[in-house]
């Protein structure tokens, strides 16, 4: 069982000394991954429903949320082992050729430690502000991931799809791994789980307790089998998010198929104290499992 840390580049951690200290400390304490979120803009008022908690995003619009790729590249320069992941990247808001280049660059600079955590988005008003249609964002995400994988693995790439068209382009540098960068999908709905089974390298479930996580994983396993894929083809991670858990819950998560738990600090102001608390309560017990 591995323990990851949510989230760098959010709120008080949007400061060079804190990004550096969090990254170095998390690596030293044995965390597996540091995760960085993404929102290009937030709004004071919106009609969209946040899929967790009360239905409202649990932070005001002026909460700092740094660009995750810049943040993780900075963290990469401060570390040598810990994995670096977007949690999550709103892929349909991006140009996939530009995003493929950004992801490959961060992966290359980190020595192959990057994971692209992907979400399709929930905040329609953010899409509208950026100028991207909210409708068909799932289909857009699928095509964008297909495009990025071509650009990461082929010397020259062509694509003629619904959203993207280009002929014989070269995108370098490539990621460290010849197969490209791992793509993990977030979400708990049936469409989200189908994305994992059909073309994901991993899953990031959120706001799930052990029994809930086990139920979702059982469904993923069914979908994988239907697609002719193996359970070992995907990595399964879960964040309890707002749900309080104890070290005793780690075994229940593991028995349900969870391989990594992503935890948020429970100290509001002292980020490093929160990291150290998570390490004592969860990283150390998880290492003994």
Where are these regions (language model features)?
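Active-site-adjacent structural elements that line small-molecule/cofactor binding pockets in enzymes
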Residues: 1-289
